[in-house]
């Protein structure tokens, strides 16, 4: 049993989940050997039986993902960034394609509505290009509209981008963005997901995806949204974790208090002071 099999097994064990897994490995200072040795004391008899069965399933899951070119990373791996679990609603396991090291680089999440107005489309391109050329990794969700603008503009500027998916890495949704996903990987970017190959898409995947987006960056920039937008999920998560949220000037969003004039290099530069 390796690190990844251990974490995936615990994650799917009845009565566990990401929060308990995080607290367990934290208790033993993220020491794999210690986590394994203490399992006998941690699990009751029913859990021990379930663990053995779930371990077989976890190993098969990892192998199936490997067969479709998807790798895995967990909280016990050194490349798994602390910002994913040292906050509310921790993430402890990821499936991915591409350069996993991007998770530890300075980044900004650029998100928004699936149907932006032409004015905000242009402003979104300008903003994304500015940050990409500064060397910041651009994080978004590969949805239509503002997410597509963020990823595409970043690639056109020669930057690196991370797409956080609500679907498995080998089954990109929406299908119309599968070519864009391939371009992201080919240009040194990264696709990440909490969902294994073969997983069924549900409406609950989207808020979980948005939660990951908010964890990866210290800053969120909203291209266009309103109070009813799904973008508010990531926005609220970001604010809850004490991070800064900006919106392009012209938006009216009740919980956002920082607006930026995209035509002002000084205002864009000011945002970079909060990216660490």
Where does each model-flagged region fall?
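Short, positively charged patches
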Residues: 1-125, 129
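Glycine-biased, small-residue-rich flexible motifs in mid-sequence functional cores and linkers
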Residues: 75-276
């Amino acid at each position: 049993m390796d690190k990844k099999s251990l974490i995936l097994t615990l994650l799917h064990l009845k009565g566990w989940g990401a929060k308990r897994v995080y607290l367990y490995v934290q208790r033993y200072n993220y020491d794999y050997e210690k986590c394994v040795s203490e399992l006998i004391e941690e699990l009751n008899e029913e859990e021990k039986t379930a663990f053995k069965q779930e371990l077989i399933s976890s190993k098969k899951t990892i192998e199936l993902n490997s067969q479709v070119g998807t790798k895995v990373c967990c909280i016990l791996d050194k490349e798994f960034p602390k910002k994913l679990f040292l906050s509310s609603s921790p993430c402890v396991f990821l499936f991915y394609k591409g350069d996993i090291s991007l998770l530890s680089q300075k980044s900004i999440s650029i998100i928004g509505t699936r149907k932006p107005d032409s004015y905000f489309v242009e402003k979104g391109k300008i903003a994304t290009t500015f940050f990409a050329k500064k060397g910041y990794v651009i994080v978004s969700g590969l949805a239509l509209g503002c997410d597509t603008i963020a990823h595409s503009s970043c690639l056109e500027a020669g930057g690196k981008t991370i797409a956080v998916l609500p679907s498995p890495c080998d089954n990109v949704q929406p299908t119309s963005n599968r070519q864009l996903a391939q371009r992201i990987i080919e240009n040194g970017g990264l696709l990440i997901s909490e969902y294994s190959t073969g997983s069924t898409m549900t409406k609950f995947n989207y808020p979980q995806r948005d939660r990951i987006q908010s964890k990866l960056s210290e800053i969120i920039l909203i291209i266009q949204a309103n109070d009813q937008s799904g973008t508010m999920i990531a926005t609220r998560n970001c604010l809850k974790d004490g991070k800064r949220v900006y919106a392009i000037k012209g938006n009216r969003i009740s919980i956002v208090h920082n607006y930026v004039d995209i035509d002002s290099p000084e205002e864009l530069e000011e945002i970079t002071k909060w990216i660490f």
